[in-house]
Amino acid sequence: MTSVLELKATARPKSGKGAARAERRAGRVPGVIYGDNQSPLPISVEEKELRLRILAGRFLTTVFDVVLDGKKHRVIPRDYHLDPVRDFPIHVDFLRLGAGATIRVSVPLHLKGLEVAPGVKRGGTFNIVTHTVELEAPAENIPQFIEADVSTLDIGVSLHLSDIALPTGVKSVSRDDVTLVTIVPPSGYNEDKAAAGAAPAAAAAPAAAAKAPAAAAKAPAAAAPAAKKK
């Protein structure tokens, strides 16, 4: 079950750049609640509280109850903008969640068993192809992260999204079987592997040559042709 956090907001009676700048000077961040076939609702939230929520992580996969004039609006953040210089939030968008809503989310990928993977023990290196997974999930069952067990991966082996059991009701939005992680061989691995394969063949050649004279020596001499009768 998705945990729901509460966020207090106030209505924003005026729109436009001038009104937005006034909100920011007052220590508030302008935003909007939209979706679910309802009219957009301009709001503002306290900048300090919003910044803490963003810094806590997983902001875009967290469901909130935005409290506005005593009424709760079930939402999920869809986007936010940061000041390019001072790096604090200057705008936020919330998507209104209706009953039974299903949404697309980008969920972090957590890897388990990195240190014990056979490929790592043999000198390979993990190449994490993607750090997030694009999923479609019920609003009440959004996973905070997806865990992938890589403890059995060897050199040259990849883990795909189809190798992971997703939570009930959650599915990938990609038509392709996304590669999540692979183990890259160490430098010179292919050359060493080829040399190792060639060594037994090279050793077998002299042995085969040595067996040939011995086999010839053991072979019985050919019988002389019988004399013709006169």
From Swiss-Prot:
One GO term of the biological process aspect: translation
An annotated Gene Ontology molecular function: structural constituent of ribosome
GO cellular-component term (any): cytosolic large ribosomal subunit
Protein name: Large ribosomal subunit protein bL25
CDD domains given in the database record: Ribosomal_L25_TL5_CTC (cd00495)
Gene3D superfamilies attached to this UniProt entry: Ribosomal protein L25, beta domain, Ribosomal Protein L25, Chain P
HAMAP family for this protein: Ribosomal_bL25_CTC
A Pfam family annotated for this UniProt entry: Ribosomal_L25p
Keyword Ribosomal protein: yes
Superkingdom of this protein's organism: Bacteria
Function: This is one of the proteins that binds to the 5S RNA in the ribosome where it forms part of the central protuberance.
Subunit architecture: Part of the 50S ribosomal subunit; part of the 5S rRNA/L5/L18/L25 subcomplex. Contacts the 5S rRNA. Binds to the 5S rRNA independently of L5 and L18.
Record family assignment: Belongs to the bacterial ribosomal protein bL25 family. CTC subfamily.
Keyword field: Ribonucleoprotein, Ribosomal protein, RNA-binding, rRNA-binding
